[in-house]
Structure formats: structure tokens, C-alpha cells
Swiss-Prot record:
Belongs to the SDX family. It is found in: Cytoplasm. NCBIfam families: SDX_Thmprot. Binds 1 [2Fe-2S] cluster per subunit. GO terms for molecular function: 2 iron, 2 sulfur cluster binding; metal ion binding; oxidoreductase activity. It comes from Saccharolobus solfataricus (strain ATCC 35092 / DSM 1617 / JCM 11322 / P2) (Sulfolobus solfataricus). Residues 3-107 form the Rieske domain. This is Probable sulredoxin. Gene3D superfamilies: Rieske [2Fe-2S] iron-sulphur domain. Keywords: 2Fe-2S, Cytoplasm, Electron transport, Iron, Iron-sulfur, Metal-binding, Oxidoreductase, Transport. [2Fe-2S] cluster binds at C43, H45, C62, H65.
């Protein structure tokens, strides 16, 4: 495991979610009622950054073409599915372990 520091827990609590750069990845992180979630932030359809969090449904939507992903599993729930050049098995997005370590949100990449 390689835990990488992202943003402060206080900042995430206030913002509820953020797309953060972690090494060579962009990761969407969220704090919903004290539970932390992390998944790839780049949509598998048109490579846009995910940004529309639905706290009640635990989903995040891509603003470009409205693809919808489950925050817990990374599974795509509503199409469009993938960019024409993307592998067909790449329907969902990778999820990551996430933790609060001394007031900092860390993601295991």
C-alpha cells in the first residue's frame, strides 16, 4: 500500500467532495456523513473530470455527457459508456481505499 496525502479533512468536510491530483492520477474524493469515498475522477467516456455529487444516491455524474457512476463501486450506472478508443472492459472507474490520518485525507494508490 502506498498512502498519498491529498487535502485536509476539514477542507473535505466543508466541500463534501473534490477532484485531487494524486501522483499521475486525478481522484474524486468525497465525505458523505463521515464516510470517505475515492474513485478515479476521469470519466471513461470523454475523459472529463467528474464533479456532480449526489450525496443521497451515492453517485457522481460527469458534466460533459451525464454519465453516472456509483461512488462505492465505480460502476457506470447510466451511459454513455466509453470513448471509442477505450477498451470495452473499461465500463467503470477504479475505486481506492481512503482514510483520515491525523486530519489529512490519504488515498492508497
Amino acid at each position: 500500500m502506498v498512502w498519498k496525502r491529498t487535502i485536509s479533512a476539514k477542507a473535505l468536510e466543508k466541500a463534501k467532495s473534490a477532484a485531487v491530483k494524486v501522483e499521475d492520477k486525478v481522484v474524486f474524493i468525497a465525505n458523505i456523513k463521515g464516510t470517505l469515498y475515492a474513485m478515479d475522477a476521469v470519466c471513461s467516456h470523454a475523459r472529463c473530470i467528474l464533479d456532480q455529487l449526489d450525496e443521497e444516491k451515492l453517485t457522481v455524474k460527469c458534466y460533459c455527457h451525464q454519465a453516472l457512476f456509483d461512488l462505492r463501486s465505480g460502476k457506470m450506472l447510466e451511459p454513455p459508456y466509453v470513448a471509442p478508443d477505450a477498451p470495452k472492459e473499461k465500463l467503470g472507474l477504479k475505486t481506492y481505499q481512503i482514510r483520515d490520518n491525523g486530519g489529512w485525507i490519504e488515498v492508497d494508490v
